[in-house]
Amino acid sequence: RVVLAMAASLAAGAATAADLEQVYRDALAYDAALASARASLEAGREKLPQGRAGLLPSLNLTGNSSWNDVNLKHYDVTRGYNNNGWQVQLTQPLFRWQNWVQYKQGEMQVALSEAQYQLARQDLTLRAAQGYFDVLVAQDVLAAATALHEANTQQLALGKKSFEVGTVTITDVHEAQSRADLSSAQMIAAESDLAVKRHALLVLTGKEPDALKGLRKGVALSRPEPADIQSWVASAETGSYAVQAAQIGREISDREVERNRSAHLPTVDLVASYGNAVGSTAAVSLSPIRTDTD
């Protein structure tokens, strides 16, 4: 939240604010961890209607149809007959404690998914700000290392000319050479570090970062209010998304124990049914088989 407030204040007046805000927006759209948390949030929200389904009435429709052929040996069958029937049954749960507990678990699952998603967004905000300022620091370090190397290179060139006219010793030239070599190595290390920090920002945002502008000079950050660490600790204990997620997870586990125990409780349902059955009779003409004998 502090980083978000800082980003908002920068967006209000500093030229770099757009850069920081853009990095954050790019990370929101690209970061895989946040995308996974967003998918988990959508899946968690489905737990509520799934749990509610156990409290709602259910309608069951059944039907049957059959045809029967009359087949009697030694007789002629004129036709068969059929039976048709259907039934509608409505069931409304009145007392199913297991379903009620499952519904409450669904509510908690939604709250847990929300807390985990907000925690992922908060983590992304910190990582985006960290990556942004890491690049700024690396740029400044490289600029300082480059300036130092240029100064040492000029001193080395001046020392060599002075040695030619005899105003300095060869030891002075060697020391100048050592300083130039050291500053060259520091500049190469700074270039490598900047490349690493820029790549980290690329992994976070999915975009190759351009040269980022530095902060305005003279930016004054206000002190946190209240300026009491204990107040912030107490606020974190109640408002932290990580703490909220842990508490909700514990409540879900407690409810799961209750749900398993309630499987042994009696259930009461209101059941209403209506049906109809129709059929035709078999009109069968039976004729004895005539046998002639000599």
What is each PLM-predicted segment?
Residues 25-35, 42-57, 87-105, 115-122, ...:
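A glycine-/polar-enriched beta->alpha junction
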Residues 58-62, 87-89, 109, 245, ...:
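Residue-level detector of the transmembrane beta-barrel scaffold of outer-membrane proteins
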Residues 121-237:
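Periplasmic alpha-helical coiled-coil/stalk elements that build and connect Gram-negative outer-membrane
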Residues 62-94, 215-226, 258, 271-294:
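Small/polar, glycine/serine/threonine/aspartate-rich low-complexity segments that form flexible
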Residues 15-64, 70, 92, 208-209, ...:
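Bacterial Sec-pathway N-terminal export signals of envelope proteins
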Residues 22, 83-85, 130, 175, ...:
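Transmembrane beta-barrel architecture of outer-membrane proteins
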Residues 1-4:
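Bacterial N-terminal signal peptides that target proteins for export
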